[in-house]
Amino acid sequence: MLKSNNASETAARKVGDKTAKKVFFRRRKGCPLSVPHAPVIDYKNPELLIKFVSEGGRMLPSRITNVCAKKQRKLNNAVKIARILALLPFVFQAK
């Protein structure tokens, strides 16, 4: 029994040595528009839409904004409608 116990201890040490290295793990943030009290995506809310548009007037990708695919499509459509109705500019001017 001592031999099997020693073998398990050495195996645990080997595993422990591998896990002793600190592994960087970035926690993935959830969709900011899917939380319970999130604002409704609507073309009549330019304050919300402007947060998802870059300084040049382009839509920010979901990998930067952490918005899920379903909400990203809704945002794209809302921004397009808001631009047509002149609630948002097509191109932001440099200051």
From Swiss-Prot:
PROSITE patterns: RIBOSOMAL_S18 (PS00057). It comes from the Bacteria. GO terms for cellular component: cytosolic small ribosomal subunit. The keyword Acetylation does not apply. InterPro entries: Ribosomal_bS18 (IPR001648), Ribosomal_bS18_CS (IPR018275), Ribosomal_bS18_sf (IPR036870). One of its GO terms (molecular function) is structural constituent of ribosome. GO terms for biological process: translation. It holds the Pfam family Ribosomal_S18. Gene3D superfamilies: Ribosomal protein S18 (4.10.640.10). The keyword Magnesium does not apply. Keywords: Ribonucleoprotein, Ribosomal protein, RNA-binding, rRNA-binding. NCBIfam families: S18. Binds as a heterodimer with protein bS6 to the central domain of the 16S rRNA, where it helps stabilize the platform of the 30S subunit. Belongs to the bacterial ribosomal protein bS18 family. Part of the 30S ribosomal subunit. Forms a tight heterodimer with protein bS6. This is Small ribosomal subunit protein bS18.
